[in-house]
Amino acid sequence: MRGLGAYATVFTPRKDFTFAEGHIIFLFNAILATDITEILVQTGWVARGVLAILLLFSLISWAMIFQKWGMFGRIRRQSAQFLHIFRSTHGVTNPQALASSGSPFANVYAAGYRELQAQVGGIAPNPHPPRLKSLSAVTVSMQLASAEEVRRVEKGMAWLATTGSVAPFIGLFGTVWGIIDAFAGLGSAGAASLRAVAPGIAEALITTAAGLATAIPAVIFYNQFLQNIRDLGQRLDNFAMEVTAQVEKAFN
């Protein structure tokens, strides 16, 4: 791997720069000229521990992201298929739609279907259908099923939220430790040997970058999945109201 200096312009102090500005530019050029692999090899046990923790967070987060992405894709396909079957027939009696399992909408419909069967003893076509004992019981059963479906798809979201909020602070810990190490090296080597400071600064920047690289994808996908869950919950509630209206029309 080539050093960062191969891709960056080395800054040269102007003659009118102050002594402090010249030293800052010297440090910046030293960091750019350092190979990243060399930095990782020379990092202390604290920085390595921080990077290992961030790597673990990142791997679990990406596994969760891919799992959620596939899950929402399946939900969209299964729900579209179920709703097409359900709305292509008239009335509540729709065994074919009930058999279309896998979709959260099918599970909500199945909960209302079971409650309806328990009250009227079956929902086969009848010119004189019995009256429902409690329409609200059918509605509540579907609402409970809807809440359970939302809870099911929410699994794993807490990990993404934790990664997005904690990873930057873990990286910040490595940053603070690297700065402390850099100043310790400056104190032991003397002000004339500023190259002793560059590895500590580079170590601090590496952990900061790792923390941000871990947190940013987790936050982005957490917000996207959270919006998907909210939309799904609203659609399930609307579907429960739609089924309730059909039940009321058919049996009351």
Q: What residue spans do the PLM features occupy?
A:
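Hydrophobic alpha-helical transmembrane segments of polytopic membrane proteins
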Residues: 203-218
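Transmembrane alpha-helix/interfacial motif
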Residues: 43-98
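Alpha-helical transmembrane segments of integral membrane proteins
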Residues: 3, 42-55, 156-165, 169
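Alpha-helical transmembrane segments of multi-pass membrane proteins
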Residues: 63-73, 216-228
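Short, strongly hydrophobic alpha-helical membrane anchors
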Residues: 4, 16-43, 193
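Predominantly long cytosolic amphipathic alpha-helical stalk/bundle segments
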Residues: 76-173, 181-193, 220-252
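Residue-level signature of catalytic and energy-coupling elements of molecular machines
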Residues: 44, 62, 95, 109, ...
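Hydrophobic alpha-helical transmembrane segments and adjacent short intramembrane/lumenal linkers
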Residues: 190-204
